[in-house]
């Protein structure tokens, strides 16, 4: 019986205090990706490229490329091309990226091309913010969208003016790294939290000895490491696999004003309150009335007059009681009981916070 109670208590403690690895909560300062950008041409399009009369930069780029290949285009030539498109190419240079390694690239049309499906990106240099070329991109573009048009009607699924080339760029220049230099490294928390920063520092000190780690602020933990790349790699591997108990997060509600979505974490609670929500709808109907003369040869004229009707309706909302809720499930039930739409729920949550009934931070993105 005692063994059973001990196992039950251990299970409850483990469930209440969830342990996570340090590597899932932090990142090493300075070990990050770097953005690359380039300008290039896509060829081989099936008549869906730029209208060169409206995008002169496409023609200029093509002339420059042909001249580099030893082909001279006569001055004043007006090339009417439909299978070429000017594009912007973006990629991310990974940390510790080595020469010869391949990375993915994203290709996006910058002209009036209708689709990049079936196109091939010609060799495009990718530069960093220092204007140095770090990679070269080239390859066939994979477009996730689809579309068709005929007789003035068209249908489209997803985007056709952007695509991706898997392993489409080769790294030609390595980015200098400061890893392995010095005897300290900084771990950065994904979300600032004073208690979590101190808890990670205490965990490292218990395993590696007092003074091995110091919490500098709510996001940064400074760690003393041995000198040399190989020693620091082994040291960081051991630290990142350590487990810490995750403290409860701040109660937060995130509202996306563009899509109307509402997301909240499990720490959100409600106090008792009363809510009344009314709906206001405006309906506009417009019809065209056609008036024709009675006699076909009487010299009359057909007249089209628009007729507009506006209807304004307001539905009153009854006052409803919202009970105090201490768990996420109860919060969801209480809000669903109001019968409000997501857009109405955004206003209700803002009013609840102003009234002091919503125990959470409200973030609108």
Swiss-Prot record:
This is Flagellar P-ring protein. NCBIfam families: PRK05303.1 (NF003676). Residues 1-19 form the signal peptide. It is found in: Periplasm; Bacterial flagellum basal body. The basal body constitutes a major portion of the flagellar organelle and consists of four rings (L,P,S, and M) mounted on a central rod. Belongs to the FlgI family. It holds the Pfam family FlgI. Its main location: periplasm. One of its GO terms (cellular component) is bacterial-type flagellum basal body, distal rod, P ring. The keyword Transferase does not apply. The gene is flgI. Assembles around the rod to form the L-ring and probably protects the motor/basal body from shearing forces during rotation.
């Amino acid at each position: 019986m005692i063994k059973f109670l001990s196992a039950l208590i251990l299970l409850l403690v483990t469930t209440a205090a969830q342990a996570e690895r340090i590597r899932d909560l932090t990142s090493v300062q300075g070990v990050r990706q770097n953005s690359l950008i380039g300008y290039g041409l896509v060829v081989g399009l099936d008549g869906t490229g730029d209208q060169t009369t409206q995008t002169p930069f496409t023609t200029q780029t093509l002339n420059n490329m042909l001249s580099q290949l030893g082909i001279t285009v006569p001055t004043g030539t007006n090339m009417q091309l439909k299978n070429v498109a000017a594009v912007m190419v973006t990629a991310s240079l990974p940390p510790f990226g080595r020469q010869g390694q391949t990375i993915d690239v994203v290709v996006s049309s910058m002209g009036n091309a209708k689709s990049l499906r079936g196109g091939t990106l010609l060799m495009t240099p990718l530069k960093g913010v220092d204007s140095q070329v770090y990679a070269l991109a080239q390859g066939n573009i994979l477009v996730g969208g689809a579309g068709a048009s005929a007789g003035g009607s068209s249908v489209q699924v997803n985007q056709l003016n952007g695509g991706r080339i898997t392993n489409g760029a080769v790294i030609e220049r390595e980015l200098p790294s400061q890893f392995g230099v010095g005897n300290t490294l900084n771990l950065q928390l994904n979300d600032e939290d004073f208690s979590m920063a101190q808890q990670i520092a205490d965990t490292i000190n218990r395993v590696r000895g007092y003074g091995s780690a110091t919490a500098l602020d709510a996001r940064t933990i400074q760690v003393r490491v041995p000198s040399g790349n190989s020693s620091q790699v082994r040291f960081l591997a051991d630290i990142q696999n350590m487990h810490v108990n995750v403290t409860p997060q701040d109660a937060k509600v995130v509202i996306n004003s563009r899509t109307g979505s509402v997301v909240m974490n499990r720490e959100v609670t409600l106090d008792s309150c009363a809510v009344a929500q009314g709906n206001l709808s405006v309906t506009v109907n417009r019809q065209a009335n056609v008036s024709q003369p009675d006699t076909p040869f009487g010299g009359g004229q057909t007249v089209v007059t628009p007729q507009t009707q506006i209807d304004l309706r307001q539905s009153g909302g009854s006052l409803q009681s919202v009970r105090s809720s201490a768990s996420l499930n109860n919060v969801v039930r209480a809000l669903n009981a109001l019968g409000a739409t997501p857009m109405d729920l955004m206003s209700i949550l803002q009013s609840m916070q102003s009234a002091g009934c919503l125990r959470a931070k409200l973030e609108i993105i």
